[in-house]
UniProtKB/Swiss-Prot annotation:
One Pfam family named in its UniProt record: PBP_dimer
Domain PASTA residues, every copy: 595-654, 655-711
Membrane topology of the entry: Single-pass membrane protein
Induction pattern: Transcribed at a low constant level in all growth phases. Part of the mraZ-rsmH-ftsL-pbpB operon.
A molecular function (GO) term: serine-type D-Ala-D-Ala carboxypeptidase activity
Organism: Bacillus subtilis (strain 168)
Signal peptide positions on this chain: none
Intervals, Cytoplasmic compartment: 1-10
Summary of the function given for this chain in its UniProt record: Penicillin-binding proteins (PBPs) function in the late steps of murein biosynthesis. PBP-2B is required for vegetative cell division and sporulation septation. Beta-lactams inactivate the PBPs by acylating an essential serine residue in the active site of these proteins, thereby interrupting normal cell wall synthesis. This protein itself, but not its transpeptidase activity, is required for cell division.
Protein name: Penicillin-binding protein 2B
Active site, per annotation: 309 (acyl-ester intermediate)
BP terms from Gene Ontology: cell division; cell wall organization; peptidoglycan biosynthetic process; proteolysis; regulation of cell shape; response to antibiotic; sporulation resulting in formation of a cellular spore
Length: 713
């Protein structure tokens, strides 16, 4: 018995010691925490604060891209995703249910707004899930649709806010502007191409946050001290692009692309006095809303090719500047041997017999320019002028992807060929920059597209571009002489530019027919050329300089190589000059009916009848949206520029009836849909030829209107 007690006492002692050690460890731990305020390396006060701190995002917007007059080219727009909560556990108060209670009623109500039948919606709501979405019909919900659904007060129906990049003009300088898209990893919009990518550091937004103290349920405490990190909206970028002039260019390119199906079209409109690019476009192009891209390059700056006879402008200018061009001196046209090889005139080397250099320019004689280079200027001086006109270097335009030229000036035949636009490859933008010297009295201007950048939060201009001279290769008197003879290229019966006459305005310019280099030589065939025209107007004091190039158009019998080029140049130049209110050299009856710029009157708060009358008095075409008696909204807004006979939209409220959109442009159709708050799907290019909803039929809330476009034959 005593032996047993001995072992029991020893066990009790060991157990007591263990408890004592455990007690002292706990006591020490508590003392450590009490003194240091830390546990497991973390400050407990901070940890406790974090558990009761919540963060709420203050969303910022990506900067907009605008034209020179502030019209939107690219902007963020809010969209919404429709979701339905099916989990009954989300409802904590039966008086305020947070899940879908009546699926039949919910399906019936939603079917009136989104493009899904009641049965399809009901199938989705009957799924075994806590939360469901509605596929493509529930994405990109407009604010107007969201408001309609919210007014229905459907339990369990909610929205997730989203943002997408929107390009209201569709195909519009797309290879210049580029596009931005959502990064799937960060869920942020980032530039992926063009100016959207290059200027991403300016356009990029930074969300802000509000940090606040909350209770256990997450609700903000009444006396919470909020910490605010302010959001930073992206900067707004204003371009030199003019929306109206760009539209003139886009519309004419679309017609030519449809009619002649060329491999490429490249065109730009520039103010030669400043170097501002007012319009720039190409075909093929794409709609940045759809991102149906086939060519990621901006061909005006990224495509170097043998320019053809437009290069003769600068050889002529060099010869005139050096006083070696004698207009009345005669030479033998047809063929001329250089470096052991024949230079041939474009009529198969037949020529026009002995002719003057003056007429050689008008006829675009290769022999005339080869002889000017070899016998009058000399190759060294010609090369000096190639340097003066900056053909050996990039222009430095503020766009990504500009490539270098390739001037072949080693062999004699290449030297002579460069004088008339073969052998050496240059970019369209290099030719345009050089031509500003001709249009701007000898002073060459560097082209640019970014005008200024504004911080919208501070309403402060953080970058301001300005015109920059790229040199003075010729004198003002030489520039005038060149313009005069280029004017004759257009007006003379022997001139190659007769197709580019514009009634009321004197045009100076030069045609180009460039051979396309292939494997082992130039491509054969009558269509395998790049046809172009470099033109300026008015001739005596040019306000606009336009370059157009059309590569490999499919010409039919009876069609001329100048047809596709002139069908872009002429309407773009004429409409732009009228839009800019440039006085015609000679006024004609037809000029009175041409496009004129004017100011949009304020038609809001007027009766429909009064607003329509006022619009018609201003030579505008009013389109009424709604059935109420008074105008509540209008597009364009008051004091914005409008053109003669332009459609203007007057929104009244009430029931909306479908208009006849036949002949409307894509832009007009999309503007109508945006103001009316209806969903319109467009397909094709050109002008509206059909619509899915008949004229005068009432447009229901969920109606999707499909409009097809086609270019006129």
């Amino acid at each position: 018995m005593p032996k047993k007690n001995k072992f029991m006492n020893r066990g009790a002692a060991i157990l007591s010691i263990c408890f004592a050690l455990f007690f002292f460890v706990i006591l020490g731990r508590m003392a450590y925490i009490q003194i240091t305020g830390k546990a497991n390396g973390e400050v407990l006060a901070t940890k406790a604060t974090e558990q009761h701190e919540k963060k709420r995002t203050i969303e910022a917007s990506r900067g907009s891209i605008l034209d020179r007059k502030g019209k939107v080219i690219a902007e963020d727009t809010a969209t919404y995703k429709l979701i339905a909560i099916l989990d009954k556990k989300m409802t904590t108060d039966v008086k305020h249910p947070q899940h879908v209670v009546n699926k039949e009623k919910t399906a019936e109500a939603l079917s009136k707004v989104i493009n899904l039948d009641k049965a399809d919606i009901l199938d989705i709501l009957n799924k075994d899930a806590k939360q469901v979405e509605f596929g493509s019909a529930g994405r990109d919900i407009t604010y107007s649709q969201k408001q309609k659904i919210e007014k229905m007060k459907l339990p369990g129906i909610s929205f997730l806010r989203d943002t997408k990049r929107y390009y209201p003009n569709g195909v519009f300088a797309s290879n210049l502007i580029g596009y931005a898209e959502v990064d799937e990893e960060t869920n942020e919009i980032s530039g992926a191409m063009g100016l959207e990518k290059v200027l991403d550091k300016y356009l990029k937004e930074r969300d802000g946050y509000v940090t606040y103290e909350s209770d256990k349920s997450g609700w903000e405490l009444p006396n919470s001290k909020n910490k605010i990190t302010a959001p930073k909206n992206g900067d707004n970028v204003y371009l030199t692009i003019d929306q109206k002039i760009q539209t003139f260019l886009e519309d004419s390119m679309t017609k030519v692309a449809q009619k002649y199906n060329p491999k490429k079209i490249m065109a730009a409109v520039v103010d030669p006095k400043t170097g501002k690019v007012l319009a720039m476009g190409q075909r093929p192009s794409f709609d940045p809303n759809k991102r149906d891209v086939t060519n990621y390059y901006n061909d005006l700056i990224s495509y170097a090719y043998e320019p053809g006879s437009t290069m003769k402008i600068f050889t002529l200018a060099a010869a005139m500047q050096e006083n070696v061009f004698n207009a009345n001196e005669k030479y033998k046209s047809g063929t001329f041997e250089v470096g052991g090889a024949p230079v041939k005139d474009h009529n198969n080397g037949v020529g026009w017999g002995p002719t003057t250099y003056h007429d050689g320019v008008l006829r675009s004689s290769n022999v005339a320019f080869a002889k000017l280079a070899k016998e009058k200027l000399g190759y060294d001086r010609l090369n000096q002028y190639l340097h003066k006109f900056n053909f050996y270097q990039k222009t430095g335009i503020d766009l990504p992807g500009e490539v270098s030229s390739k001037i072949n000036f080693k062999y004699e035949f290449d030297k002579a060929s460069t004088a008339y636009g073969q052998a050496s490859a240059v970019t369209p933008i290099q030719q345009i920059q050089a031509a500003t010297a001709i249009a701007n009295d000898g002073k060459m201007m560097k082209p640019y597209v970014i005008d200024h950048i504004v911080d919208p939060d501070k309403d402060k201009t953080i970058y301001q571009n300005k015109p920059e001279s790229a040199g003075t290769p010729i004198s003002a008197s030489t520039a005038k002489k060149v313009r005069d003879i280029l004017g004759e290229v257009v007006t003379s019966k022997i001139g190659t530019g007769q197709a580019y006459k514009i009634e009321g305005f004197d045009v100076a310019g030069k045609t180009g027919t460039a051979q396309i280099a292939g494997k082992g030589g130039y491509l054969d065939g009558t269509d395998n050329y790049i046809f172009s025209f470099m033109g300026m107007a008015p001739k005596d004091d040019p306000e606009l300089l336009i370059y157009v190039a059309v590569q490999q158009p499919q010409l039919k019998a009876g069609q001329s190589s100048s047809d596709p080029v002139s069908e872009i140049f002429n309407p773009t130049m004429k409409n732009s000059l009228h839009y800019l209110n440039i006085e015609p050299t000679e006024k004609s009856d037809s000029d009175k009916e041409e496009t004129k710029a004017q100011t949009m009157p304020d038609l809001t708060d007027q009766t429909v009848a009064a607003a329509q009358k006022k619009a018609k008095e201003e030579n505008l075409t009013p389109i009424v949206i709604g059935s109420d008696v008074a105008v509540k909204e209008q597009y364009p807004k008051a004091d914005e520029e409008v053109l003669t006979n332009q459609k203007v939209f007057l929104k009244t409220g009430g029931k909306i009836k479908m208009p006849d959109m036949t002949g409307w442009s894509r832009r007009e159709v999309l503007q109508y849909g945006e103001l009316a708050g209806i969903h319109i799907e467009v397909s094709g290019q050109g002008y509206a030829v059909s619509q899915s909803v008949k004229k005068d039929k009432e447009i229901k809330d969920k109606t999707v209107i499909k409009v097809k476009f086609k270019n006129p034959d």
